[in-house]
Amino acid sequence: VICTGATLPRDLPIEGRNFKGVHFAMEYLTATTKSLLGEGADSCPISAKDKDVVVIGGGDTGTDCVGSSIRQGCKSVVQLEIMPKLPMDRAADNPWPEWPKVYKMDYGQEEAAAKFGDDPRVYQTTVKKFVADATGAVKELVTVQIKWEKNDKGQFIPVEQAGTEKTIPAQLVLLAMGFLGPEQPLIKAFSVDTDPRSNIKADHGKFNTNVKGVFTAGDCRRGQSLVVWAINEGRG
């Protein structure tokens, strides 16, 4: 039974990506959890204590990064979101019983607002480059605002807005921009089929792959999701 998750993170290949202090979100969250379960928070190899933290990405993983940074005693935290801020009320094309696409604050943002006085999210913003200090560690990043516009094919694409560049201090940058699917070496080793999103192909409820005797469940089958879905499929 293959239950390896969908841990391949989306990267940000821009200038300065390899500076010290720029990490994938799961590197940070995993290290934080292991330190808390082991020797304690002070032993964490990636710590937000007394640092300006920038979280890039607005999903559940980004929220966890915001909350963990605050609990470690960060100096400040900013969460960059490439999408626009959602409306306070449902739009006409988002009726019940559809999932409400409205503005909300999750626990991470609420903790940030309680400590620093405001929602840490900055919307319709992307990162141009990272800037390092003399030791090669990240010290700040340069952002630019974007606007979503339709191209010739009718697809919405992000367009940078001239004159909106801004520098934000950051000694710790956490990349929480989603996941691209499960790690591929093990999948290839078992010769199982994958779907267009590179997840292992198997029907929900049966979980059998194209290879006899090989089954799969959880995020490596359905794609990156919440742990409750993995628990549900494990019980199934």
Identify the residue ranges that each predicted region occupies.
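A structured beta-alpha segment of the ubiquitous adenosine-cofactor-binding alpha/beta core
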Residues: 41-44, 110-120, 124-171
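FAD-site-proximal beta/loop scaffold in flavoenzymes
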Residues: 18-50, 149-224
